Amino acid sequence: NHRTDVRTINTSLLATDWYMDQMKRKAYKSDPILSNLTHKQYAFGNRDYIKYENLSDERWTLKKFMTWISSNEQRIKERRKYKYILEQYGYKKEDLENVPLFTQNMIYYPTNKLRFYVNKENVIKSGIINPSEIDKIVDYIDIDIPKSGLYKNQILMLDILSKNDWERPIYFTGGSYKDSEYIWMKDYLQLDGLVYKLVPIKTPINEKNPYQMGRIEPNRMYDIVKKWEWGNSESSDIYHDPETRKNSISFRGNLHRLA
């Protein structure tokens, strides 16, 4: 029972152009991943890292942010270069000659505050949440991205999120607790078995136990875990290495949360 309609994305490899090219092609029954960025825009040497420049407290929509990053409009292309910022700080032509061209051409973003609106119709249509919980759906999710900069794989994660618009469920495998691994939306997760689904229902992280992320929808979770198959763990012929023991503790912890 393999789900060939599901697309698995290795977010570390998103930093490579060849991998993103693969994601944008249909594979088996899995539709392509949609993106605002063209191959040329995420090819090696382009948007490998973009810098934060604190110019505004305005909260941009995620779509506006991606337009800023991806637009081919000449006016935007010139204004988003770090060279433009240096000129606003009073740099003259002769001053810029001492600034590496790479730095001058680096893209910056003027605010780290983003807003991701929830398409409630798509949320229900795609089965992301139970229709009985429609009253819990938020209108938007506020995302605070780093005040340092973004690497290419992080840009593309935001890109995929924006373009998807809640048409396909998005899951995270867990195993990491870094905010960036969940696109800075750890308060909007739902534990489904061993994975975390992005849902438009806020569940704040418990500060006393920050490793227990996400809400649980009991009926769905119960249905999932009842399909798990176990065996041979009790055998004395099986060596349980440290990683295996860690995984078994995670499984037990998830079952404990359901109980």
Predicted regions and their residues:
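ER/secretory pathway lumenal C-terminal domains and tails of membrane proteins involved
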Residues: 2-258
